[in-house]
Structures are given as structure tokens and as C-alpha cells.
């Protein structure tokens, strides 16, 4: 099992997380991607290396998506056949939940499944106070919106589309490396594409842990939300345009060819549905999301 943690300007929470993971399973490979944090944060990464953590470094900040792809490529080249579990650097994922997702991912890998195992934040932390379990308003609104729009666009219900705790079976690593997006949109794009790429989405309940004020988060609400929603809007727009325009054009052509109205309506709907499926499939595989 490889535990992949992208990190940008982390604090000691990352060191504590790595030590807790090492204590729980000394055999697990912990891989941290320093996403251009800069010299001021070098002592933290040095401390991680001393503790036996593998650290790969981007010379400049590229974004979470790029850091995840760097880690996936490293794992594929250096530890082929192993599952990958991603976690956030701010300590919002408990070690026991990280390993729960990892074990479930290993089970799927042994079965030869193409799977993404999602740690969905639905369980309160019994060891945290009121502030430690209270979901920030922007996170609550953002996740509720993406859950709803994701279901509308794909027909799939995922309780936590923004979770950073995910398990990947080795069967999908090549596919993951082909998904575009260097920042936060990468994680959402993989979920959209999974619904069209025969990749199973499995949900595992985990404890929700939030730091008051989330001081170590580098998420920019406006810019990064726009990036996340761009692939979703492209997906929905393609569905509307192909559905409405193709439907109307096909109906006009079929009626013009002399088909009875009922036959023309049914034929137009079939043509529209096939076109919609084809366009969405191209969108998901050729860089539209």
C-alpha cells in the first residue's frame, strides 16, 4: 500500500500524520509530494525524510492535481501492482480511516476491479469538541451543490464529491494519468469520467474532522470553485445542446422525409439519445473534463 500525500506549505500536522501512519503500519510506503513549497518549508520535508518518508519535489507550485499525478507516476514506476491511497496533508483524515480505505482498495484490487474507493465524511468524531465536528459553511454549501449537480449530470449518487481520501486500484493508474487538470478540478474530473469509463465508485464512511478556521487550507473559494465546476458545466451543456438541438433537427429531417409524426418523434429521440451518449463519452475521454 502506498499512501500518497500532496503537500503545499504544510505545518507540523503533516509530520504528526506521517508518524502516526508509520506507527500503525511500518510496511506502508508513505509518499509525500512537495508541490513547490519553497525553502522556508524545507525543514519539515527534511524531518519527513529522516522519518523514512519518500519525498518528491516540484521546483514550483503546480497544483494538487499535478502533485497527485506525480505521485501516481512514481508509484507505477517504483511500486507496480500496489494500491494507492491519497490523503490530505492537514491532518483531516484519521490514520485508522486511511487504512480502512486502503484495506477496502486492496480487496478490490485482488478481485481485479477498476475502482475508486471514496472515504465519505459522514461520521462525527467522538473525540472532538463541537468545533472539531462542525462542518464549515462554505464546505457544507460547496459539497451539497456538487453532490446535487453530480447526480444530475451522471445519475450517480456520491455523498462526498470533494473528499481527498481516495483509494485507487492498480488497474486504473494509467487511466488516472491521462485525466487532465493540474489543480483541484482534477479530483472532480476523475469522478465525472469514472461514470463513463467503467470505473466503480465505492463509498466508505469515515470520520469528519475539521480544524476551526481550516488554517492550513490553500483552497481559494472563487478561483478553485470555478475550476471544479468547469468540467461539470461542460458536461451539462453538452447534454442540453445535443439533447435539444439534435432532437429538433432530427425531427425536422424525418418529417421532411415523409415519416409519420409519431415515427419521426420516436426516431428523433433515439438519434438524440445516441448523440448525447457519444458526445459525453468523447468529452470525458478527450479532455473536456
Q: Where are the model-predicted features located?
A:
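Hydrophobic helical membrane-anchoring modules
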Residues: 11, 179-256, 269-289
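Conserved short acidic donor-positioning loop in nucleotide-sugar-dependent glycosyltransferases
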Residues: 9, 35-39, 62, 71
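Short, well-formed alpha-helical segments that are part of the catalytic scaffolds
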Residues: 9-23
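Cell-envelope/extracellular polymer assembly enzymes that use nucleotide-activated donors
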Residues: 1-2, 29, 189
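Conserved donor nucleotide-binding strand/loop of the catalytic core
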Residues: 46-81
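A conserved acidic beta->alpha catalytic loop
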Residues: 34-43, 91
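Short beta-strand-to-loop acidic/aromatic patch adjacent to the donor-nucleotide binding site
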Residues: 81-92
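Acceptor/aglycone-binding surface of glycosyltransferases and processive sugar-polymer synthases
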Residues: 59-60, 66-74, 95-184, 211-219, ...
